[in-house]
């Protein structure tokens, strides 16, 4: 996959910016809060339809504007496609592919594939379980666009079930029939989500473990384990068996759920356990080890997306490359070579290995405006 052109209109601090990408590596240089991350955020939105930094679309629309627009020309397997996303400050989106409007957001997923590595990703190791669930779901959305509808349905059912749990039993009357209905819905959709997550981890683990061994010099062994609230002996287990176990787990927590007024069983509470040599990775205090682990996860994600789609995704590195030592920089460069288009943000070029700068397109970002940098090197 190759991103040829990007047009940001009233997006974040960009009023009307056009960028042509002319090399496999593009380095965006500028001080903090100038718009480097905003550009990567726009590309990530095209890939996942989600922003990790904004709770609502109105945060993405430039102050004083009614709507924002992201347009892109991407090349997939040698064929060019025109993409457009419009975000309205009052809510609502419109999506177009090659000029054709789409009714469902899931039909847009898969048009762009991207792997993002930013300082926020250290939360995969040291953060709450939600960070790891969000990462896993983000990978699934790119590999299986229909997963978006599954997650949205599950969230709606969870919301309805929690509302019923919060009702006063005396005021609500007999909740048993209603609860049985929502239990069955939660079990059906929840079991589909957890089975997909577990299968994805099965595919990611050997890839991540291999990358981790290479980066750490073979000194450590990485493991990825899905820990669902519902017993799951095998990700390939019969869906009906998993649903039955799901319902049994709900019944076991019924009293606690009524007391707390919230659902305690389901993929919204599951954990993804990252281990190093059999010990929880969050117990490792070294930031170097944490970065090694996250880098291995991201390289595994990149490799799996390429395996499934037959085309390497974009790689977006947000202010992390300069923080990697030369060994890790070289491991990453060896992994992507020239076949993976990479967009990198940084405040300075001094910590970059010369191999990263060779042939790179270097752009200066200042107050929402982008221009070629005097530091740009000729294309190799």
Swiss-Prot record:
Entry GO terms, CC: cytoplasm
PROSITE patterns to which the protein is assigned, alphabetical: RECF_1, RECF_2
Protein keywords: ATP-binding, Cytoplasm, DNA damage, DNA repair, DNA replication, DNA-binding, Nucleotide-binding, SOS response
InterPro entries in the cross-refs: DNA-binding_RecF, DNA-binding_RecF_CS, P-loop_NTPase, RecF/RecN/SMC_N, RecF_2
Subcellular location: Cytoplasm
Gene Ontology terms describing biological process: DNA replication; DNA synthesis involved in DNA repair; double-strand break repair; SOS response
Single GO term (MF): ATP binding
Record keyword Lyase present: no
Keyword Nucleotide-binding: yes
One Pfam family this sequence matches: SMC_N
NCBIfam families: recf
PANTHER family: DNA REPLICATION AND REPAIR PROTEIN RECF
Family note: Belongs to the RecF family.
Summary of the function given for this chain in its UniProt record: The RecF protein is involved in DNA metabolism; it is required for DNA replication and normal SOS inducibility. RecF binds preferentially to single-stranded, linear DNA. It also seems to bind ATP.
HAMAP family according to UniProt: RecF
Name by which UniProt lists this protein: DNA replication and repair protein RecF
Organism whose genome encodes this protein: Synechococcus sp. (strain JA-3-3Ab) (Cyanobacteria bacterium Yellowstone A-Prime)
């Amino acid at each position: 996959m190759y991103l040829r052109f990007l047009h940001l209109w009233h997006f974040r601090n960009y009023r009307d910016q056009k960028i042509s990408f002319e090399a496999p590596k593009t380095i965006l240089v500028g001080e903090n809060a100038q718009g480097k991350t905003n550009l990567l955020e726009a590309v990530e939105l095209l890939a996942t339809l989600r922003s990790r930094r904004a709770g609502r679309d109105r945060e993405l629309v430039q102050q004083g504007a009614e709507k924002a627009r992201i347009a892109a020309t991407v090349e997939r397997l040698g064929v060019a496609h025109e993409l457009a996303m419009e975000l309205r400050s009052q809510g609502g989106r419109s999506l177009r592919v090659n000029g054709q409007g789409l009714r469902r957001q899931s039909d847009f997923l898969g048009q762009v594939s991207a792997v993002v590595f930013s300082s926020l990703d250290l939360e995969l190791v040291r953060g709450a379980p939600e960070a790891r669930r969000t990462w896993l779901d983000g990978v699934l959305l790119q590999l299986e666009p229909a997963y978006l509808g599954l997650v949205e349905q599950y969230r709606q059912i969870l919301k309805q079930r929690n509302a019923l749990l919060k009702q006063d039993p005396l005021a609500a009357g007999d909740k048993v029939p209603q609860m049985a209905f929502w239990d069955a819905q939660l079990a059906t959709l929840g079991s589909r989500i957890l089975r997909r997550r577990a299968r994805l981890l099965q595919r990611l683990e050997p890839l991540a473990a291999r990358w981790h061994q290479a980066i750490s010099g073979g000194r450590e062994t990485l493991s990825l384990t899905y820990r669902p609230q519902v017993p799951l002996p095998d990700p390939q287990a019969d869906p009906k068996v998993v649903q039955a176990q799901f319902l049994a787990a709900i019944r076991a927590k019924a009293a606690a759920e009524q007391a707390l007024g919230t659902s305690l069983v389901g993929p919204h509470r599951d954990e993804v356990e990252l281990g190093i040599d059999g010990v929880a990775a969050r117990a490792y205090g070294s930031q170097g080890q944490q970065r090694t682990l996250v880098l291995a996860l991201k390289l595994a994600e990149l490799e799996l997306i390429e395996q499934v789609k037959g085309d390497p995704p974009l790689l977006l590195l947000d202010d992390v490359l300069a923080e990697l030592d030369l060994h890790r920089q070289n491991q990453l460069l060896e992994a992507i070579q020239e076949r993976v288009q990479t967009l990198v943000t940084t405040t300075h070029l001094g910590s970059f290995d010369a191999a990263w700068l060779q042939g790179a397109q270097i752009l200066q970002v200042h107050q929402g405006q982008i221009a070629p940098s005097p530091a740009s090197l000729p294309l190799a």
